Amino acid sequence: MADTSQRLAIVGPGLIGTSIGMAAKRRWPHLEIVTIDAGQPLSLIGHALVVVLAAPVDAILSILPELPAVIPDTALVIDTGSTKQAIISAAAQTRIKHFVGGHPMAGGTSIADARADLFDGRPWFLINRSEPDALKRAAKFVEALGATPVIFEDGGEEHDRLMAAISHLPQITSSMLMAVVARAAGPDNLHFAGNGLRDTTRLAASPASVWHGILASNREHVAPLLKFLANELHALADRLDDPVAIAAVFDEANRSRAALGGEKEPATFLRNS
């Protein structure tokens, strides 16, 4: 994409989309970038060489059927949705010739957190759909943005299962925790809380408009984890006076939290491109 006559189209200029645009400008200062927000015509994509769908999952699912009529046959289409199976399945039903499902593991709380280095050193998951040329182009693109491409070979199921555990369960747990705390303490008493509550409920500030589509499209993996967590909490509630049970929970959590640390290496079932 070094040719200054080439265009990048970003559909959905939120935190991720805006950061992609900023990172692309950092890499290719003279690149033409067009951003398309909700309600604007997709025809604005024009002759874009790369089209990035950076909208929420449910919006991406609505956009995909409309793309073939407005994009060049040679255009590479990449999405950034937090779940992959539903999106990849929907893309396969269209006439999009070069599509790669993707998911950058980077973010923030709002568009105010957008920055050019958001993806530097971060994993960017890409799903291999037996299109080696498109996958290679996508990997080069995300590398140019500073990210490390990590390839899933199974069509998105393993990605969605992993995200249910490390992203989607923490989100819904944080939201539910904040709601329960507010009911139990009373809204007028929340200002007495210390940093512990703020730290453990940071994700509770996330908008439902983004997460509805994520949770709905990954229900098969998220629901069992929620039930497992509920069962674990229920069992612990009956053993709060048992020091051995409490120690077991805290010890496992301490070890796991230490392992989380600053590690950014992909899991063993992933393969770097």
Which residues does each PLM region occupy?
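Rossmann-like NAD(P)-binding element
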Residues: S43-P72, L76
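Interdomain hinge/lid region at the active-site interface
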Residues: D188-R257
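Rossmann-like NAD(P)(H) cofactor-binding subdomain of soluble oxidoreductases
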Residues: I63-D113
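Anionic-ligand binding region
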Residues: L135-T201
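NAD(P)+-binding Rossmann beta1-loop-alpha1 motif at the extreme N-terminus of oxidoreductases
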Residues: M1-G46, V50
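Rossmann-fold dinucleotide-binding core
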Residues: A91-F152, D160-M163
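Phosphate-coordination loops involved in phosphoryl transfer and adenosine-cofactor binding
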Residues: T4-R7, T74, G121
